[in-house]
Amino acid sequence: SALDEQSFARHASAMAEKNSLLAERRKEVAEGWGPKYIERVHQKGKLTARERIEALRDKETPVREVGTFVNHGVKFGKLKSPAAGVVTAFCQVAGRWTMVIANDNTVASGSWWPKTPEKIERAQEMALRLRLPVVYLVDCSGLFLPEQSRSFAGATGAGHIFKKNALLADAGVPQIAAVFGDCIAGGGYMPIISDRVAMTESAYMVIA
């Protein structure tokens, strides 16, 4: 059948608008809590989570972020947790596809929110199925306490992250952690269970 050029143009225009909107939403999420908090991270001599991933990945290779819109549009009181406060992405490191899990230190100092555990667990599950090394970029102030009752409960609560750590280890999937500054409570368990841990001079771990 002949191509309906008018229909094609109409749908192409509508799709272009949606792609533009999607790009805007991705940019909003990438800014975390905004320029003020990005600047606060930089004033501490740190990089943001996405800047760390950019520095880690092989040059001129893509970063395939997953779970970008977890918690999108959801409010916790007057606060938001863009991407659930954690960046999960596939990227190539030393020529090998890798799953990177990085706390977003522009959102409540990298704390965990509702859906943060599920997002981390999903990334771990993908790494396990694909046998991809996991790199944890940890800069985590622990659980966002006002929402703790919604973060631990259920079959996919925070404790299951550590079960995934064990399953990855049992399957022989490498797990490497880099700790930058805060590493408190649940955020501290992932480095402890990893095969290798690197810490900056100002980094510390507190297990609770």
Placement of each model-derived feature along the sequence:
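Terminal-region recognition feature
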Residues: S1-D182, G186-Y189, I193-V206
